[in-house]
Amino acid sequence: MTLASGIEVSPEGVAAICGRYRIRELAVFGSAARGDMRPGSDVDILVEFEPGTHPGLGFFRLEEELSELFGRRVDLGRKSLLKPLVRPSVLRDAVVLYAA
């Protein structure tokens, strides 16, 4: 699949990573979702884990794997931890790439 920003990402790769890390939903937001990325921009990704999943240090491994998959540095955030002030704009921009 191709994001609005022109980044190519493998749906199978996304699904495999999400399965390994017990991710319920993965979405891209920010400039990658809107299509206004700059050359040095990172990819903002929001995840929601399956109930009872506590990734611990696996969160950082997940960020590294996603960076490899997207071919850019990934800034990973948890949907459940979004601050109320930014939540509406983040969710408005979000493009879901995986949902279980």
Language model regions located:
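Catalytic core of pol beta-like nucleotidyltransferases
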Residues: M1-E25, R34-P39, E50-A100
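Conserved histidines in hydrophobic membrane contexts and catalytic metal-binding motifs
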Residues: V28
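N-terminal beta1-alpha1 ligand-phosphate binding loop
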Residues: S31
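Short hydrophobic/aromatic beta-strand micro-patches
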Residues: L46-E48
